[in-house]
UniProtKB/Swiss-Prot annotation:
It is a multi-pass membrane protein. It is found in: Membrane. Residues 1-27 form the signal peptide. This is TM2 domain-containing protein 2. The chain crosses the membrane at residues 129-149, 167-187. Coiled coil: none annotated. It comes from Xenopus tropicalis (Western clawed frog). Glycans are attached at residues 29, 40, 76. GO terms for cellular component: membrane.
Length: 198
């Protein structure tokens, strides 16, 4: 009676499994840290315990941190240079018109991490949303533009009163505002962007 011989592939796979098991056991028993002389760690702060399980707080994924909104310096370039982050202006029609800045983030409570819990992160766009929807404003402009409702909605109160008193500039101002709104020339007065509808 002869025993069946397993295929060579199974023997090789079993040998690799044993080799992996022994290497894992031997690496867990190692007590002295391994030094790597060719690594440059000057760019990142050195953690307290390099063999520990904690990750630097600044390396945490987005779901484990909460970030503030970008700081509004209201056009003050000196304040932006002193703080080294924040926005001089908000909004823009094209990607190139929008400033980008870092924001202050904090690790959430209950998340264990190494290093300072507050840090600067990201390249966030200087955009704010204040509840202005393009389609709503376009409908206001089309149906009630002669009464200045579109300008009131966007916060341009002075020109809205003038448009109301002249009944949309006898239709000319109504038509011009409709074209300006469609082409992006008429935006909210607080420099916010249009809210998107998903």
């Amino acid at each position: 009676m002869r025993w069946p011989v397993p295929p060579v592939g199974y023997l090789l796979l079993g040998g690799q499994g044993l080799l992996l098991t022994f290497s894992l056991i031997s690496s867990q028993n190692q007590t002295s840290p391994v030094t790597y002389p060719d690594l440059n760690l000057s760019a990142a702060p050195e953690p307290r315990d390099p063999l520990g399980p904690l990750v630097l707080c600044s390396y945490l994924p987005e779901e484990f941190v909460e970030c503030d909104d970008p700081v509004d310096h209201m056009g003050n370039g000196t304040a932006q240079q002193e703080l080294r982050y924040g926005c001089k202006k908000f909004g823009g029609q094209a990607y190139g018109d929008v400033e980008h800045t870092q924001v202050m983030c904090r690790a959430l409570d209950g998340i264990e991490c190494d290093g300072p819990r507050s840090f600067l992160r990201g390249n966030k766009p200087c955009i704010k949303y204040t509840g202005h929807y393009f389609i709503t404003t376009l409908l206001y402009s089309f149906f009630l533009g002669c009464f200045g409702v579109d300008r009131f909605c966007l916060g341009h109160t002075g020109t809205a009163v003038g448009k109301l008193l002249t009944l949309g500039g006898l239709g000319i101002w109504w038509f011009v505002d409709l074209i300006l709104l469609i082409t992006g020339g008429l935006m909210p007065s607080d420099n916010s962007n249009w809210c998107t509808i998903y």
